């Protein structure tokens, strides 16, 4: 009988979709106007794989002080990152970037993991990579080599599996044109399997700024 009344009044027990900034959520999609990047493809290292993407996993990072990072991982090798301060409305958005993973590899020994994420390995003021010179923009005012920035990321995928990733990150940038920058994100990831054993991964991803006007949400 209760099912009858639920149908009659249009009510159901489906949980509300958890939406983030711009209404993005699991299984939603988004398109990008990539013309500006196509015109610079000879200057950029990043290769944008397409213009339409499906969100296969979402994550949230609380930076404290009202600052948050929302990440929308696609079914490919990309993720859309939205930084906000004070809330999740459009006026709270500070920054939107699209990152594409260039490489990633697993690390099996703890000693190698420690070496990969120490200040000397990933915290220099400048970095030479892919025959380009990159400038650190994480804590750019600090001199010398610095420790990576720790961020706890809470992830959920399309199967509603949830887990935490301990990120040790460093961001670099290089100026491509007067108003265009390309970003290099170095990231050491530590997570734990069902047995409580650590699993380590190191990755490099290239990114670009995404103007709000070039982003369209689907679903």
Residue ranges and their predicted role:
Residues 1-51, 58-219:
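Mixed-charge, low-complexity intrinsically disordered regions
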């Amino acid at each position: 009988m209760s099912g009858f009344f639920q149908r009659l009044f249009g009510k159901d027990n489906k949980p509300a979709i958890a939406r983030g900034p711009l209404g993005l959520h699991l299984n939603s999609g988004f398109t990008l106007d990539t013309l500006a990047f196509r015109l610079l493809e000879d200057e950029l290292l990043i290769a944008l794989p397409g213009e339409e993407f499906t969100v296969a996993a979402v994550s949230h990072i609380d930076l404290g002080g009202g600052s948050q990072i929302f990440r929308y991982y696609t079914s490919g090798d990309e993720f859309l990152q939205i930084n906000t301060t004070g809330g999740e409305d459009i006026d709270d958005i500070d920054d939107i970037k699209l990152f594409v993973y260039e490489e990633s590899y697993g690390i099996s020994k703890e000693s190698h993991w420690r070496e990969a994420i120490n200040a000397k390995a990933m915290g220099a003021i400048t970095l030479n990579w892919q025959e380009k010179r990159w400038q650190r923009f994480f804590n750019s005012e600090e001199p010398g080599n610095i420790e990576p920035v720790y961020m706890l990321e809470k992830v959920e995928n399309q199967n509603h599996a949830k887990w935490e990733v301990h990120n040790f990150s460093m961001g670099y940038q290089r100026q491509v044109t007067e108003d265009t920058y390309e970003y290099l994100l170095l990231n050491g990831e530590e997570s734990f399997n069902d047995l409580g054993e650590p699993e380590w991964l190191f990755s490099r991803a290239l990114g670009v700024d995404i103007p709000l006007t070039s982003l369209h949400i689907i679903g």
